[in-house]
Amino acid sequence: MLSVPRDLWVNVTGIGEQRINTAYFLAEIEEPGTGAQNAKDTIEQNFGVKMDYYILIQFEGLTTVVDAIGGVDVNIPSPMSGYDTGVIHMDGTQALAFVRDRSGSDDFFRMARGQIFITSLWKQLLQPNQWGKLPAFVGSLSAVLQTDVPVWLYPRLGFALLRTGPDGIDSRVISRDEVIPFTTSGGAQVLGPNWEAIDQIVEELFGVTPE
């Protein structure tokens, strides 16, 4: 799992040089319904990793999903802005604030929080005493999820996630060490990619060598 900073300055498919987080919404403005595919194309074009499918959930949908299973116990491994080390039970509103908050930190910390939350949610759902909540989880998720994953593939993906478990996933973040902050000619403060360093991460994670 690789988290990419939203201000990374890349060549956005069909648009040109822009922040990577514009790949979705600028395409949606131009032609509704094309945003997800354009985001996939942009990732493939810049990182050299084939994107088979996408899963999109709006931040607000996270609240619905978390509340549907009665909250999530989030394990915070080290002190963060506003949070001490340990397990904190979060409802939907608290979980949304946790993954979105950048106060006292920045986008790099936000990405780390996102991975911490996903791992905590995953571990919780794998506990036998939580299996009774899976129907509510799946139902709430399907209501707020947008994806091109075919339905027939759902069981296979589910078994793969169950077999692998969150501890079997290598999670990385494109950090300050892989970017160079700069200001564009238009005055935007963005992050220039150090492709040599990023390509090394991509090769280690996905086993591909970007061209």
Regions found by a protein language model. Name each.
Residues 1-211:
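Non-catalytic, solvent-exposed segments at the cell envelope interface
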